[in-house]
């Protein structure tokens, strides 16, 4: 799991990777412990937006799609979140179940799912779903390949490319991992929401809602390059 905090200082975007072992988390992730750690860290940093790369909810039976949520169709995600317990491919099931549970735990701790687009610009705290591949595309950059397909030096090359586009400084830039860079690029949407003018923000999907004891649908929030017409206030 890659974690990265972002803030703005005098127009500069400052990013700092955070290693989970330093926060006391080791071994196989557990949703309750991870949610508690994320919330504690966010409160220490004074953050109000937390981005999670993973599905926040299951498919609505009435969305007109066979296998996926609306946001997944719009962004062409490789994994599809179907009705509760059903995923495509089936090997994604443990990850998706974990992600939905993580969002549930975050909501219990006071960090709910985003209810609508207007709420994004309020002063409220939210746990937001991200999709780093779409974040790269939204910035008109080629996505970072999957970890297994990323050649040596590619993470540093992509970080340099991102730094040429936006005013970013990264603590320990030479040691940034694949997952941390993915967390960084996804988190740029939060920087845009908080008023940084270097990029905008877009939402895919529809508002989340509860049905038969489980959450369905939801928004995926991504950064967007302002000079392409893709950015939305």
Predicted feature descriptions by range:
Residues 1-233:
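RNase H-like (RuvC/DEDD) metal-dependent nuclease/polynucleotide-processing core
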């Amino acid at each position: 799991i890659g974690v990265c905090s972002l803030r703005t200082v005098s127009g500069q975007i400052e990013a700092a990777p955070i290693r989970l072992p330093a926060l006391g988390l080791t071994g196989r992730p557990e949703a309750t412990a991870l949610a508690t750690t994320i919330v504690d860290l966010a409160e220490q940093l004074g953050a109000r937006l937390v981005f999670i790369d993973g599905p926040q909810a299951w498919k609505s039976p009435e969305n007109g799609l066979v296998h996926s949520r609306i946001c997944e169709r719009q962004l062409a995600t490789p994994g599809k979140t179907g009705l509760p317990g059903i995923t495509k491919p089936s090997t994604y099931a443990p990850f998706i179940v974990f992600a939905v549970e993580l969002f549930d735990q975050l909501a219990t701790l006071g960090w709910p799912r985003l209810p609508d687009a207007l709420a994004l610009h309020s002063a409220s705290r939210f746990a937001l779903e991200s999709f780093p591949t779409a974040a790269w595309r939204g910035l008109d950059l080629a996505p970072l390949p999957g970890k297994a397909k990323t050649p040596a030096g590619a993470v540093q090359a992509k970080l340099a490319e991102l730094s040429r586009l936006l005013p970013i400084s990264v603590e320990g830039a030479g040691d940034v991992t694949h997952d941390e860079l993915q967390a960084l690029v996804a988190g740029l949407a939060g920087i845009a929401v908080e008023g940084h003018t270097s990029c905008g923000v877009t939402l895919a999907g529809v508002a989340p809602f509860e049905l038969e004891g489980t959450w369905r649908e939801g928004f995926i929030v991504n950064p967007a390059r302002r000079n392409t017409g893709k950015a939305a206030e």
